[in-house]
Amino acid sequence: MSQQTYSLEGAGEGQVNITDASGDITIVGWSQPRIVIYADEDDQPEAQWQGNVLNVSHVHDAQLRVPESASVSIERAGGDIEVVAVRALRIGMAAGDTELSRVGELSLGTVAGDLEIEQAGQVSIDAVMGDLEIHSAAAVNVGRVNGGAELHRVGPLRIETTMGDLEVHEAEGVSLGQVFGDAELHHVGGDLMASTIRGDAEVESVNNVQLEKVSGDLVIRDVQGSVNAVVQGDISLHKLPSSQSHTVRADGDVALGLDPGPVTLNIQAHGSIRWDRSLGLTVQSDTRRQLVARLGEGGGEINVNAHGDVVVYPAGEERGRRGRGRHGWVMAGAGEGPRVPPIPPIPTIPPMPSLGGIPVAGVRRPPVNLVEERSVILKMLAEGKITAEQAARLLDALGDA
């Protein structure tokens, strides 16, 4: 293996531009003020060095050492990419898997394989055709993930489309477009907003929750703010804060755990409505399918509309809601309250607003010249720089752009 070395002039940070690579690329930052390219003797890339900028082309398999202060740009890569410890990184198109760690500003176009990121600053991604995994990032903005997505310890998170399952642990606010699998979100420091979740959803430790549509079941635990949700399955709400206003609609059953505190209940159900006697509710209207009740004076309001059954119990007694309750159940319309005219309809859930002046889950992408990109991919295939499988994945990715 031979090497090419380029020393920085003055206090320059360094810039590396790789226009096309047919093999695997490994780039590692170091404290030295120089750039070194390691490659086989027969596969030396073409390099031009001018003004602390290194332009590299015709790369097969290569390893590069660059200053940690350097910015790196990879236009197209036919193999796998690994980058460690650089100030900024931009990748236009990657046919293989991509692993990135300790990267400052990160901008990615299309990754045809899996993408793994650890310790990054601002992250912007157009499309990942495989799975996405991120551990620690200042902010994340994603257009499309064809596989599943797993994120830990991130700042504000926006994802437009996730075709697989989504799992988030610790985020400073989450904005989602469509999730075609299940969604699991824990410890969201800000608000959670989602347009569509086609599987089940589980939410824990979050401020405000707004879900326009959940096709499966919904479980919410430990909410600090309000909940607005439309669910086609069952809803389980554990410990809703009584000081907030909530509106939920379910095609299935609803289980509601009340936090001790003043609140007004407005419940409509096609099935039965039951509540635990220990709650001490003051019933205002009680029919077989409707209940208006109050706990204390003032507080928030909880609006429930269910096609199935509704059960209300003290927060923290989830097991009791399936049995008799601590002091037995009271059932609406069982003769313990007068029949009254229908109560006013439950308020509709407003459309999901923008977050911070940016459209929800929106990702701004530069325009793509599809004809030019397809020509480049086919040329790389003809020259043997990428395999037929890699070319097919890249062409499929362009078709989704």
Residue ranges and their predicted role:
Residues 1-401:
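Intrinsically disordered, low-complexity terminal regions
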